[in-house]
Amino acid sequence: MTTPARLAIVIAIAASFAAAQSLDFATYRAKVEPIFLKKREGHARCVVCHAGAGNAFRLQPLDPGATNWTEEESRKNFEAVSRLVNSANLLSSPILKHPLAGTAGGDDFHSGGRQFQSKNDPDWKTIADWARGSQSK
């Protein structure tokens, strides 16, 4: 591998790490995390498949009877979801690309179906805004 190629890889890794450091937990908890609990017509809630999952998008299981996560559980979810944000190329972020319809730029890696039919879906936009660094107001 050439030196410029190695440098490009190091820069991309550093940018992703910096983005993960700059993502806002309060915004995540108030605006993004509720999306994972939301029932979408024709789909299971994200938490149903991703609680305790063995993949990168692993959400904490909800306690019996709970309708939300505790702050500690939310922080663990935040850490897992933050790793799915690619700040160097936001639209290639797995958290945005996997559940998006192929016709809107998504991919085939989400076995839970196309949760978002377009980038205009309000929930997709909420996740994208958070990934860009928007903060809760």
Task: Give the role of each language-model region.
Residues 1-9:
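Bacterial N-terminal signal peptides that target proteins for export
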Residues 20-137:
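Aromatic- and Gly/Pro-enriched helix-to-coil junctions and flexible linker segments
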Residues 11-20:
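Hydrophobic h-region of N-terminal signal peptides that target proteins for export
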Residues 9-12, 129:
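A ubiquitous, low-specificity "background" feature that marks scattered single residues
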